[in-house]
């Protein structure tokens, strides 16, 4: 696969999207807003086996302001938002052929000292929650300290936003 050919990458991601029980019924507009900016910004990982795509993830580097916007409406990110800060969020994670573990290991190795968060939705209840992930070499206590700081900054900012709809309680 040629990572320098965005159409080839797009084709591989389309194949994975269509093969995923979670993603295949989503509208094309979600594909466009969740995949195209990642390819343009080179903020994605695409795993292949025998030249066939097996797993894909994308991430956005959000500012606090855009993080709040994303949590309030996961369809709200525009291309500029993807590179607006240093708060990493997994936007898409697809591994329809059983390669979730391989993608997880790849990302922990690619970003050994980084922290990521993701919104994960329970397919049965449709309830979302924020999950946290960290690279393979970062000290867990340090990671927890930084995540707590993220939470504090987030809660401080959303307290004054009357239009914020995301629940901060479990």
Curated annotation (Swiss-Prot):
Source organism superkingdom: Bacteria
Keyword vocabulary terms for this entry: Acyltransferase, Cytolysis, Cytoplasm, Heme, Hemolysis, Iron, Metal-binding, Transferase, Virulence
Keyword Hydrolase: no
Regulation of its activity: The acyltransferase activity is inhibited by heme.
EC number: 2.3.1.-
Reactions catalysed: tetradecanoyl-[ACP] + L-lysyl-[protein] = N(6)-tetradecanoyl-L-lysyl-[protein] + holo-[ACP] + H(+)
GO annotation, biological process: killing of cells of another organism; toxin metabolic process
InterPro entries assigned to the protein according to its UniProt record, in alphabetical order: RTX_toxin-activating_protC_bac (IPR003996)
Keyword hit for Iron: yes
Function: Protein-lysine myristoyltransferase that catalyzes myristoylation of the protoxin (HlyA) at two internal lysine residues, thereby converting it to the active toxin.
UniProt similarity note: Belongs to the RTX toxin acyltransferase family.
Quaternary structure and interacting proteins, as annotated: Monomer.
The name this protein goes by in its record: Protein-lysine myristoyltransferase HlyC
Organism of origin: Escherichia coli
Biological classification of the source: Bacteria, Pseudomonadati, Pseudomonadota, Gammaproteobacteria, Enterobacterales
């Amino acid at each position: 696969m040629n990572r320098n050919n965005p159409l080839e990458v797009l084709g591989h991601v389309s194949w994975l999207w269509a093969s995923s029980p979670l993603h295949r019924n989503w509208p094309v507009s979600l594909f466009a807003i969740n995949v195209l900016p990642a390819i343009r910004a080179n903020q994605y990982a695409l795993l292949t086996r025998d030249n066939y795509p097996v797993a894909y993830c994308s991430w956005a580097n959000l500012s606090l302001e855009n993080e709040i916007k994303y949590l309030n409406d996961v369809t709200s990110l525009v291309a500029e938002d993807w590179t607006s800060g240093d708060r990493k969020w997994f936007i898409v994670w697809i591994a329809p052929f059983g390669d979730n573990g391989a993608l997880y290991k790849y990302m922990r190795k690619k970003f050994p000292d980084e922290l990521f968060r993701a919104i994960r939705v329970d397919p049965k209840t449709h309830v979302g929650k924020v999950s946290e992930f960290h690279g393979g070499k970062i000290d867990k206590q340090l990671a927890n300290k930084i995540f707590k700081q993220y939470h504090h900054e987030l809660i401080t900012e959303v307290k004054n936003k009357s239009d914020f709809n995301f629940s901060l309680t479990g």
